[in-house]
Swiss-Prot record:
CC per GO annotation: chromosome
Disulfide bonds: none
Sequence positions that bind Mg(2+): 9, 117
Gene Ontology molecular function terms on file: DNA binding; DNA topoisomerase type I (single strand cut, ATP-independent) activity; zinc ion binding
Source superkingdom: Bacteria
Function of the protein: Releases the supercoiling and torsional tension of DNA, which is introduced during the DNA replication and transcription, by transiently cleaving and rejoining one strand of the DNA duplex. Introduces a single-strand break via transesterification at a target site in duplex DNA. The scissile phosphodiester is attacked by the catalytic tyrosine of the enzyme, resulting in the formation of a DNA-(5'-phosphotyrosyl)-enzyme intermediate and the expulsion of a 3'-OH DNA strand. The free DNA strand then undergoes passage around the unbroken strand, thus removing DNA supercoils.
GO BP field: DNA topological change
CDD domains to which the protein is assigned, alphabetical: TOP1Ac, TOPRIM_TopoIA_TopoI
Segments of this protein annotated with the region Interaction with DNA: 198-203
Domain Topo IA-type catalytic: residue ranges: 164-581
Active site residues per record: 325 (o-(5'-phospho-dna)-tyrosine intermediate)
Protein's recorded name: DNA topoisomerase 1
Subunit details: Monomer.
Length: 868
């Protein structure tokens, strides 16, 4: 009897689904996308035959050249916007084996179920699978489920659907738009600004947000202000701290020490009389169940997870069947989910924690209500009971579990008190709050202490308080806060830029391109990021407009719902975009994109005597001779490195940013904070932070010490030279002063051990591609990974039996592993694991994918079984 074939996109998901389907189904994974538009540099078809231009005039030759360049561009992009958006999809490298297996299984199957994820990306994967496998469309059915549970899968297979081509076309539209912008604008940036630059339809808009915030911070001028607090005692000698809030009926707002001291002098001799004590009930409602953006934000603030890590862990939890689908913008909960939560609350917390009716939360206008919020698949699966999940995945599940319960619990109830005291013309206040009923905070306590969470001492109206001390405090206004990953996601969501499925990719891409970087989990715009943003803003105003980008997301939603035609929208976009691109490609004098400008200075070139200019490259700011613009034979290539005078503003913590801004010189032309660099022992240059848009700079002469390197030093394991601490786009690392060797800085601040050359095992083939395994030794011990990483990212633990078989290939430091037992007492294969706590490798085993309790340690030169 033939079986039905079920195709999903991940092995973990296939493993979970397989537990719930009967023997009449064969469940296989496509391991993500199986085909895509061509990668850069891939060859597609035969090369076009050259066209002879002999005898043609200049206009005809230019026309032939333009046609040739256009055809080459279309070939690289893999889509042809000039001919009805014809796409050249190709099987992804390394996926040939997967495709061959799926085709073979499909031939034998009586029906094929495409069970990829329920979002547009999942719909597109399903469509690509159907297109590649081929055959009658009637053989294919689409099944979707919001959670990988027995009941959800049963319902999905009872009511299979057809592929939704509107959703597929929405995904293709997004892909084509991004492809066009990236492939057609990036070469322009290479030509006009600097080689190696790139642009993205949504990513460039996200960078714009960060650049604007960077400039707000640099332009910000801190202003002084003072606060005055008064420490008093009531008649029972209980301490009460009062803040001065008003003076003569207006807000108390001293701008300097003189104004503050005037108040202090009066308050030191004044009487303090209680004039009012108001107590009223207040409450704190629970937040809605998680959607993608709020999960990312809360995981960042409560757990310290980055957006990418949060989504990776959520994906694993979903594929293991523990939570519902993690890419959603809907706060909707099914009736079954509500019943599950309410039953659990009543049984485990009591009736007082159960509202009369379920709590409902509104979703944003374009949210897909068919989707649910992120919640546990089964509330009875407690965090500590999860099997096969790493520690951080369990922590994330615990957060989701608690938020789901909290959202269906009553508000926390407080008694909030405000004490008002007068001292002459001054009004002082103290606030307190007492928790009367914890409500939802029973399962999800609020983080951070509220300064009002105190019980005010007992006082009566007209009571006089005894003065203990008057405390004036100087403050300075703070610049706008820098974006964290979580805050940036919140801002993107608020502006309607991107969707739940794209936030993580946007955050990752803008960091990888080098236009921004993160330090202490906060974003800093690099100078090149500012320049590229300016050029794109000037030449592609509509593309960089926040509202236009948000409206395009709405258009994609309309395509997905079948309201508008996808190619009509693509054609309209391309028409407008092509017009802007043509203008941008012109010379600057004709209205084209401005080149990467320089700022000429009075500093003379030490080689030719011409003026030096402030230039910006991807690596930073430097001085370059203006003679570089001359013809090759006369060209002067002299450059001078600029050494930052001290730690730059962008490596300081947020609390220090105000002081740093105050200490920096201000540009006399635009008022922006200046960056200071040492040129040599006798000169320093202060450059406007808004360079090159502002040509302000200042030369300071004197005697300056060029600070040498005084950081940590380790010996290079390749050449023996010193390795120094450096800062790159992905954070701190150790770099050799002599060769190109680098070493990571671990999360605990230690320098990672030297990188060992991988040991190749061509005999050990990967399961997911045609690659073979190599043995790598990293910061977390040894492991097997594909030899062509990162093209193939397949990894697995090292088996002792393999090390024994190929002992002669092992480096001396790893030879001891080959002496470990090859199997446990139950004949399960022994594998190598690494203990982060003890920082050493040990041997254990697995049975049916789960770790056994058998552990062997290497102690005193021999392998010893650990006592249970």
């Amino acid at each position: 009897m033939s079986k039905s074939l079920v195709i999903v996109e991940s092995p973990a998901k296939a493993k979970t689904i397989n537990k719930y389907l009967g023997s009449q189904y064969v469940v296989k994974s496509s391991v993500g996308h199986i085909r895509d538009l061509p990668t850069v540099g891939s060859s597609t078809g035969e090369k076009a035959k050259p066209i002879s231009t002999k005898g043609m005039d200049a206009e005809e030759k230019a026309k032939i050249k333009a046609e040739k360049e256009r055809n080459a561009l279309v070939k690289r992009m893999g889509i042809d916007p000039y001919h009805d958006w014809k796409a050249n999809y190709q099987i992804l490298p390394g996926k040939e084996k997967v495709v061959s297996e799926l085709k073979s299984l499909a031939k034998k199957a009586d029906h094929i179920y495409l069970a990829t994820d329920l979002d547009r990306e999942g719909e597109a994967i399903a469509w690509h699978l159907r297109e590649v496998i081929g055959g009658n469309d009637d053989r294919f059915s689409r099944v979707v489920f919001n959670e990988i549970t027995k009941n959800a899968i049963k319902q999905a297979f009872e009511k299979p659907e057809q592929l939704n081509m509107d959703r597929v076309n929405a995904q293709q539209t997004r892909r084509f738009l991004d492809r066009v912008v990236g492939f057609m604008v990036s070469p322009l940036l290479w030509k006009k600004v600097a080689r190696g630059l790139s642009a993205g339809r949504v990513q460039s808009v996200a960078v714009k947000l960060l650049v604007e915030r960077e400039r707000e911070i640099k332009a910000f001028q801190p202003e002084e202000y003072w606060e005055v607090a008064v420490l008093t005692n009531n008649q029972n000698k209980q301490a009460i701290r009062l803040d001065v809030t008003d003076y003569k009926g207006k807000k108390f707002d001293p701008k300097n020490q003189k104004e503050a001291q005037s108040a202090v002098d009066f308050l030191n001799v004044s009487d303090y009389v209680v004039t009012d004590l108001e107590t009223k009930p207040t409450s704190s409602r629970p937040r809605a169940p998680f959607i993608t953006s709020t999960l990312q934000q809360t995981a960042s603030t409560r757990l310290g997870f980055g957006v990418k890590k949060t989504m990776m862990l959520a994906q694993r939890l979903y594929e293991a069947g523990y939570i519902t689908y993690m890419r959603t913008d809907s706060t909707n909960l099914s009736q079954d989910a509500l019943n599950m939560a309410r039953t659990y609350i009543e049984n485990h917390f009591g009736a007082q924690y159960l509202p009369e009716k379920p709590n409902f939360y509104s979703s944003k206008e374009n949210a897909q209500e068919a989707h649910e919020a992120i919640r546990p698949s089964d509330i009875r699966a407690l965090p500590e009971s999860l099997e096969g999940m790493e520690k951080d995945a369990v922590r994330l599940y615990d957060l989701i579990w608690c938020q789901f319960l909290a959202c269906q619990m009553p508000p926390a109830q407080y008694d909030s008190s405000t004490l008002t005291v007068t001292a002459g013309d001054y009004t002082l206040k103290a606030k307190g709050r007492i928790l009367r009923f914890d409500g939802w905070t029973k399962v999800l306590p609020q983080i951070g202490k509220n300064p009002e969470d105190q019980e005010l001492p007992s006082v009566t109206v007209s009571e006089k308080l005894a003065l203990k001390e008057v405390q004036p405090t100087q403050h300075f206004t703070k610049p706008p806060a820098r974006f964290t990953e979580a805050a940036l996601v919140k801002e993107l969501e608020k502006r309607g830029i991107g969707r739940p499925s794209t936030y993580a990719a946007i955050i990752s891409t803008i960091q990888e391109r080098g236009y921004v970087r993160t330090e202490n989990r906060r974003f800093y715009a690099e100078k090149m990021g500012e320049i590229v943003t300016d050029r794109l803003n000037e030449s592609f105003g509509e593309l960089m407009n926040y509202d236009f980008t948000a409206n395009m997301e709405d258009t994609l939603d309309k395509i997905a719902s079948g309201s508008v035609n996808w190619k009509t929208e693509l054609n309209q976009f391309f028409k407008d975009f092509s017009s802007q691109l043509s203008k941008a490609e012109l010379d600057e004098l004709e209205g084209g994109m401005r080149p990467n400008s320089l700022v000429e200075t009075d500093i003379k070139c030490p080689t030719c005597g011409r003026n030096m200019a402030i230039r910006t490259a991807s690596t930073g700011v430097f001085l370059g001779c203006t003679g570089y613009a001359l013809p090759p034979k006369e060209r002067c290539k002299t450059t001078i490195n600029l050494i930052p005078e001290a730690e730059l503003l962008n490596v300081l913590d947020e609390s220090s940013e105000t002081k740093a801004l105050m200490d920096r010189k201000r540009c006399t032309k635009c008022g922006t904070a200046m960056d200071s660099y040492v040129i040599d022992a006798h000169r320093k240059i202060h450059i406007c932070g808004n360079n090159p848009n502002c040509d302000g700079y200042l030369i300071e002469e004197g005697s300056f010490k060029i600070k040498g390197y005084d950081g940590p030093v380790v010996e290079c394991d390749k050449c023996g030279a010193d390795m120094h601490l450096k800062l790159g786009r992905f954070g701190k690392y150790m770099g050799c002063t002599n060769c190109d060797n680098t070493r990571k800085i671990l999360k605990n601040g230690e320098v990672a051990p030297p990188k060992e050359e991988p040991v190749h095992f061509p005999e050990l083939k990967c399961e997911k591609s045609d690659a073979y395994f190599v043995l790598r030794d990293g910061a977390s011990g040894v492991f097997m990974s594909a030899h062509n990483f990162p093209k193939s990212r397949e990894t697995r633990p090292v088996k002792i039996a393999e090390l024994v078989q190929y002992r002669e290939r092992l480096p001396e430091k790893l030879a001891y592993l080959a002496d470990a037992p090859q199997k446990d007492p139950e004949e399960n294969e022994a594998i190598v694991r690494f203990s982060r706590k003890e920082k050493k490798q040990y041997v254990t085993s697995e049975k049916e994918g789960k770790a056994t309790k058998w552990i062997v340690d290497f102690t005193n030169g021999k392998w010893v079984e650990r006592k249970k």
